[in-house]
Amino acid sequence: MERYESLFIRLKERHEGAFVPFVTLGDPGIEQSLKIIDTLIEAGADALELGIPFSDPLADGPTIQNATLRAFAAGVTPAQCFEMLALIRQKHPTIPIGLLMYANLVFNKGVDEFYAQCEKVGVDSVLVADVPVEESAPFRQAALRHNVAPIFICPPNADDDLLRQIASYGRGYTYLLSRAGVTGAENRAALPLNHLVTKLKEYNAAPPLQGFGISAPDQVKAAIDAGAAGAISGSAIVKIIEQHINEPEKMLAALKAFVQPMKAATRS
């Protein structure tokens, strides 16, 4: 959890925002997935947002659903994902690692056991995509018991009451949604969300990172100009994996070429 705080302090001193890529663990296979994550970090990723393959991903558009299918095809299990997380943490001791998941995966293990395992392998945050704030008590309580930041999604139409709850219960960062709907780079992020950012700050929420539809450096810059602490990009990155599925080296080069200008756009 503290890794996020340290990161945001460091970035503020350097007048930078955070660039956070999302990928599905085990896509397209364990070995290449670990290389992908190393490449993202080497190219400038400030934190990681990682998915555990799940059979019914509600918030995911087709690009990320396909990533899940590729990981399943490679036989990747949640247990192997935790082994991968331990390896990533060992190799990259300071980078914040967040999981983006669904409640069933948490329930499968037992809520407390799931967060205990997150703590053990060095996961900093967990966003449970299909659990709304008002139903989050058992998740966030278990998270805090195990020093894992509970992350909440702030939708573009959030009312004052929801903003207060997100500010009160969330830790690490706040996932600021560019727009409603499913993830996907083909739906570009909409208007700057200045009013939400202002309110979240007023209520002392964890720093907002804008996600959904972030696929170009100008959008990263716009998110930061609107007051966000950074931007999360998922589908655009997963698409690169898909496009180079049979060319592992080209894939890594293309990922590097995508991340570098996205990170550069966070520097004022």
Swiss-Prot record:
E.C. no: 4.2.1.20
Pfam families recorded: Trp_syntA
Keyword line: Amino-acid biosynthesis, Aromatic amino acid biosynthesis, Lyase, Tryptophan biosynthesis
Gene3D superfamilies: Aldolase class I (3.20.20.70)
GO molecular function: tryptophan synthase activity
Keyword Amino-acid biosynthesis listed: yes
InterPro entries listed in its UniProt record: Aldolase_TIM, RibuloseP-bd_barrel, Trp_synthase_alpha_AS, Trp_synthase_suA
Pathway entry: Amino-acid biosynthesis; L-tryptophan biosynthesis; L-tryptophan from chorismate: step 5/5
PANTHER family for this protein: TRYPTOPHAN SYNTHASE ALPHA CHAIN, CHLOROPLASTIC (PTHR43406:SF1), TRYPTOPHAN SYNTHASE, ALPHA CHAIN (PTHR43406)
Subunit and interaction comment: Tetramer of two alpha and two beta chains.
Known role: The alpha subunit is responsible for the aldol cleavage of indoleglycerol phosphate to indole and glyceraldehyde 3-phosphate.
Name of this chain's protein: Tryptophan synthase alpha chain
Species: Escherichia coli O7:K1 (strain IAI39 / ExPEC)
Gene: trpA
